[in-house]
Each structure stands twice: as C-alpha cells, then as structure tokens.
From Swiss-Prot:
Pfam family name, one: CTP_transf_like
Span of the signal peptide: none
Gene: coaD
Subunit structure: Homohexamer.
GO MF annotation list: ATP binding; pantetheine-phosphate adenylyltransferase activity
Cellular component aspect of the GO annotation: cytoplasm
InterPro entries given in the database record: Cyt_trans-like (IPR004821), PPAT (IPR001980), Rossmann-like_a/b/a_fold (IPR014729)
Role description: Reversibly transfers an adenylyl group from ATP to 4'-phosphopantetheine, yielding dephospho-CoA (dPCoA) and pyrophosphate.
Reaction catalysis annotation: (R)-4'-phosphopantetheine + ATP + H(+) = 3'-dephospho-CoA + diphosphate
GO biological process terms, semicolon-separated: coenzyme A biosynthetic process
Protein name: Phosphopantetheine adenylyltransferase
Pathway the protein contributes to: Cofactor biosynthesis; coenzyme A biosynthesis; CoA from (R)-pantothenate: step 4/5
Length: 160
C-alpha cells in the first residue's frame, strides 16, 4: 500500500496555534505531512526562513510523521520534488475560500495530477492569522492564546 504524502505550505510568520491545529489534523489523516515554509521575500517577514523553519520544527517535534522544510520558487515544483500527491490548505472563513478556490483551480490547470485538500481549524482558531498576531504583538498586546510560548518568547525578543 502506498504512503499518502501531503504538503502544507505557508509563510508561517509566525506559526500560530491555527497552523499547528491544521498540521496536527493533517498528521492524523495522512501518512506523511511536509510543512513547507515559503521564503516569501515579498512579504518582508518578521522572522528569517531559517527561524521560521526552526520554530515550526520545535513546535511540531512530537509529530513523528511531520517534516518541516523551507522552500522558494513555485509550490507545485516543490510538491513534485517531495513526491507528494496533494496540498493541504487551511480555511478559516468564507473570505479565505474565494482565494483558495482560485488558487486550487490554477494549480489544477498547471498540475492536473495534484489535489488540494481543505481543512478547517478548531473554532477557537478560526480567526487567528499570523499578520494579526504580529500586529497585536507590535502594539504590546497579549498574543498568548494565539501562539505557543516559544513563539511568544521569540516575538518578544524580535520586538525588544
């Protein structure tokens, strides 16, 4: 029986409890999950690619079938290189759906053999976004319910 490998891509700047929830759900459904941390230089991330990979690796270290890798370039090329059959995407709200639906359609046009699988996070994570977490932290707000203690500590150090 073949192993089902999927890729969960994102910038993860920083990785939030919502991201973590999606990864853990995917890890329960699929044999192998690759968390693909995008370089995303155009987004001017708070953390470097290596820092984001390190944070995600640390937070997900208890998941034996999860691997965290950085990548740059076209996602579908990375997915093929990994030998994955599908991309996992998180949907928080209807506003995410339109963009994700368009992206899934474009990916299917370019790579017909790839599937996109949508997962929704637990209710308490539905409205968490990395950009909102960064904004709250920059304004000295409490982000503890949105990120792990390790991420909160690293953000505090970045903003010091």
């Amino acid at each position: 029986m073949s192993q089902l490998k999927v890729v969960y891509p994102g910038t993860f700047d920083p990785i939030t409890r919502g991201h973590e929830d999606i990864v853990r759900r995917a890890a329960g459904l699929f044999d192998h999950v690759v968390v693909a941390v995008a370089k995303s230089p155009g987004k001017h991330p708070m953390f470097t690619l290596d820092e984001r990979v390190d944070l995600a690796s640390s937070i997900l270290s208890d998941c034996p079938n999860v691997e965290v890798l950085g990548f740059s370039g076209l996602l579908m090329h990375f997915v093929r290189e990994q030998g994955a059959r599908a991309v996992v995407r998180g949907l928080r709200a209807v506003s995410d759906f339109e963009y994700e639906f368009q992206l899934a359609g474009m990916n299917r046009q370019l790579f017909p053999e790839m599937e996109t699988i949508f997962l929704t996070p637990a209710e308490q994570h539905m409205f968490v976004s990395a950009s909102l977490v960064r904004e709250i932290a920059q304004l000295k707000g409490d982000i503890s319910q949105f990120v792990s203690p390790l991420v909160q500590e690293r953000i505090t150090l970045k903003l010091a």
